[in-house]
Amino acid sequence: MSIDLVFVAPDDPLADGMVDAMQEAGIRAFGPNANAAIIEASKVFSKNLMKKYGIPTAKYEVFNDAQKAIDYIKNENTAPVVVKADGLALGKGVIIAQSVDEAIEAVKEIMEDKKFGDSGNNIVIEEFLTGPEVSVLAFTDGKCVKPMVSSKRPQACF
């Protein structure tokens, strides 16, 4: 018995290059390679990509220094605000802070206490947007794009 095709879905193996490794070993694999998976694996990369190509996204700032992030929060004095660990954090790396104090605490937890390990070396602080969150995904081979059915994440996840 041999392996015909491997579907790689979890974020960590995709970001770590599992599809690349399978293909190098001659095993057909379905999923993005590591270069494409960075869109999901790095909030900083994805936000900067959206900005570069004019894709609408929430106003944001990126920080690699906790004190600079805290100073920004104090100067902006806006809540609620969203604090995101840059890297993968098993779906737990997004904190919706309802107050300035909560936002400062989120920065400390992520960057100083290393709540999400190295995934919190950089953070994104972005404006809080209201409304439904919808995911739109598509299959592509680099030439042709086939959209999937859109989905809506229940707000209770946050």
PLM features: what roles do these ranges have?
Residues 1, 76:
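Active-site charged/polar residues at nucleotide-handling catalytic sites that mediate phosphoryl
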Residues 14-16, 69, 133-134:
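Short, well-ordered alpha-helical microsegments
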Residues 140-144:
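Short acidic-glycine loop/turn motifs at beta-strand connectors
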Residues 145-158:
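ATP-dependent carboxylate/phosphate-activation module, predominantly the ATP-grasp catalytic core
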